[in-house]
Amino acid sequence: EMICARTVEEREAALAKVEPFQQGDFEAMYRIMGERPMTIRYLDPPLHEFLPTKDEDIKELAADMGMTFDDLKNVVASLHEFNPMMGHRGCRLAVTYPEIAAMQTRAVIKAALNVSAETGHVITPHIMIPLVGEVKELKFVKDVVVKVADELIAAAGVDMKYQVGTMIEIPRAALTAGEIAKEAEFFSFGTNDLTQMTFGFSRDDAAKFLGAYYENKIYESDPFQHLDQIGVGKLVKMAAHDDLFIQRLGACY
């Protein structure tokens, strides 16, 4: 419903239905984690991944949503991308549809406030914005997060801290980490996407030619099974230099 929305108002109405489910999931996670740090990555996959591709499945979903088959089929077609790995996903979704980031922030902060009040635990939400390649992207989404989070925390009358960080998974992000660090309180290196974008091939498609690369001694092993020290590792090292004012560095494999 949210994906098929034609206006901001329709999208916000659909997101309002999703929010309680996200909040419930986050509350369950915070209860399990206690005061241990937990990082929540905001919506990353392209939207087409949430829709069916087979006609019979589209027909069934259209009936459930009260749409015609043709209308839903057109939505699916409109979301098609030639290279979805580098397409409309990650922070780009939040820039295009800031109401998504606002909803996720409400779910995260409300969950943290509720579980903190219920258990007495000091919970510090760590919110991670994915696929940032330009500091202004991060600032745009961070402004949405901070506005929503600060309003909820003030309304609750508590002094809950939270952090906003990002994934370093685009080569440009690694090269401009010093600038991005001005808006991020932590980094997590997304080694899967960073490897894909540095090598220039998709993990899903590489099997078609990697066998020949092994046979011809071009690669000794799958670049996705270990961190490439010479190329990808160099980008990580450049991004993690000592003069960054970053509180926490991590990796997502």
Predicted feature locations:
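Conserved alpha/beta-domain cores
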Residues: 1-253
